[in-house]
Structure formats: C-alpha cells, structure tokens
C-alpha cells in the first residue's frame, strides 16, 4: 500500500521569527505590570487608577478582536484572506509602534490619559498580530501536527 500524501516540512526560518515575535508580545504584556507602581508614584494616582494600565492594555485585545470581526462580517470575507497573515502581523506591529509614540508626549506632559491611550493602541496592534500569527504558525508546519 502506497502513501500518496505529501509531507510538508516546517519552515523553520519563518517559524523562528514568529517565535521571537511571540516572545516579545509576552515580554511587553508582562512588563505592563512594572508600569503600575511607576505611574502610581510619579503621577500621584490611586491604586484604582494605576490598575487602568492593565485594564486598558487587555481591554484593547477584546475591542480589537471585535473590530476585526465586524470588519470581516461587513465585508463577508475574512480580512486576513485578502491582507495575508504576514501583512496582518506587519500592520499590527505598525499600529503598536504608533501607540508607543504616544509615550513621548505623555512623558513630556505627565499625562496619564496619553499613557493609557498609548497602551490601548499597543494592545489593538497586538490583537491584530495575534489574530494573524496563530493561524500562520499552523500553516508554517505540517498540517498533521498543526
């Protein structure tokens, strides 16, 4: 009996890059907790307000996912099918980078609102990156083990 199925080899160079990106998402997400005592002390915030750091960042994941779903439903087609997974990750990285740019005026003006807005935008970018990266990770490997 002959096996006519072809085996897809894992594309390790692309997969390695994706692993590094996943590491940095985790690193940034874990680093948000470091900002809480810093903001609390330097911006004279209550404990409740300082916890908005985590709230804004993780709420952005939910909001970003809902926005992505609404766009895909409105178009009657998955946005990533047209954009591509790699481009989706790239656009997400650009959105996240734009969010980090808000930290400059936020630091100059000691504006907690700008800091939180920047973190929210970073979270929106991360949402798009992860929506694109998870199926890409499966596609890069053997579908049998995906």
What is each stretch, according to the model?
Residues 13-45, 65-68:
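Extracytoplasmic
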Residues 16, 45-56:
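Loop-to-transmembrane helix entry
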Residues 21, 53-54, 118, 146:
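Hydrophobic positions within alpha-helical transmembrane segments
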Residues 23, 99, 111-129:
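Hydrophobic core of transmembrane alpha-helices in multi-pass small-molecule transporters
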Residues 26, 90-109:
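C-terminal ends and interior cores of transmembrane alpha-helices
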Residues 51-78:
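Central cavity-lining transmembrane alpha-helices of secondary-active solute carriers
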Residues 82-89, 115:
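Primarily marks hydrophobic transmembrane alpha-helices of the MFS/SLC 12-helix fold
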Residues 128-142:
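Intracellular juxtamembrane helix-capping segments at the cytosolic ends
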């Amino acid at each position: 009996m002959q096996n006519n199925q072809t085996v897809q080899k894992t594309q390790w160079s692309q997969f390695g890059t994706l692993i590094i990106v996943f590491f940095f998402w985790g690193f940034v997400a874990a680093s948000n907790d470091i900002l809480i005592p810093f903001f609390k002390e330097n911006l004279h915030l209550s404990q409740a307000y300082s916890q908005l750091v985590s709230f804004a960042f993780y709420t952005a994941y939910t909001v970003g996912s809902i926005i992505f779903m609404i766009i895909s439903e409105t178009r009657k087609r998955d946005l990533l099918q047209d954009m591509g997974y790699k481009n989706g990750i790239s656009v997400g990285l650009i959105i996240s980078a734009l969010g980090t740019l808000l930290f400059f005026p936020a630091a100059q003006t000691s504006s907690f609102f700008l800091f939180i807005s920047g973190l929210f935008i970073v979270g929106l970018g991360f949402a798009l990156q992860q929506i694109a990266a998870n199926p890409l990770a499966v596609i890069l490997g053997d579908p049998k083990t995906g």
